[in-house]
Amino acid sequence: MIDRAQFELIKMKYGHYASWAIWADEGEKPKDNVGDLSVFNIESNVGLLHQLNPGIILVGLNISRRIKFPLANFHDARSQAMDYKIRYALKESPFWGAYMTDIIKDFEQKVSGKMMSYLRTDKLFEDKNVEIFCEEMKDLRIDNPTIVAFGRDAYAILNRNFKNKFKIFKIPHYSNYTGKEKYREEVKSILCFT
C-alpha cells in the first residue's frame, strides 16, 4: 500500500502519462464511466489507497494524444477508445489497482511503428525514458515489480532494457480488434489468474 503523500507525489510527477488500474463500474454500456476520474479522489473514495498495488506495473508504449487531466491515461472516455477492455480484463483480479504508465513519456504518436522507427534513430531518447521509468519505480518504492507490457513494442523496449532484472509479461494490446470477453480470457491465460 502507498500513503497519501506518495500518491500525491506520483500524481504530480507522472500524472500526465501514468495512472492506476482502477475504474468506476461500467453502466448500461461497456464503455460507460471508464473516464470517471472521481475514483482517484481520496476524500470521496476513502478506500482508494488500500486498492493501489505499486508492486505490479502495467506498461504501454506511449501516449496517443495529450493527457489533459492527471491520472487520465488509460481512462479514455472517447467513443473510439478501447481502455474499457483493460477495466473488463482486470476487474476482480490481482492486477486491479496496479500502477499504469508508458515506457516512452511525452511523445504523442498514434502509430506505434513510427514510435519504434524514431527509437531506432535516437537511442539516447530511449535511454532517457528508461531512466524516467526507473525513477518512477523508485518513487513507487518498489525494488522488484511484476511488469506487464501492453503489446509487442512496449515489451520489446522493456525486454531489451530490463530482461536480466525483472520478470516481464507480454499481454495483447487492448486496442487489438477483439471483444472484451476474449481479451479478458487472453489476459487471464497469460497472467494466470481466474
Language model: regions and residue ranges:
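A polyanion-binding, active-site-adjacent surface
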Residues: 2-146, 156, 169
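Hydrophobic/aromatic-lined pockets within catalytic cores
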Residues: 91, 159, 176
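Short, flexible loop segments at boundaries between secondary-structure elements
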Residues: 164-194
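Short loop/helix-cap segments at secondary-structure boundaries that form the rim of catalytic
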Residues: 157-164
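Short Gly/Pro-enriched loop/turn and capping motifs at secondary-structure junctions
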Residues: 105-106, 152-156, 174-177
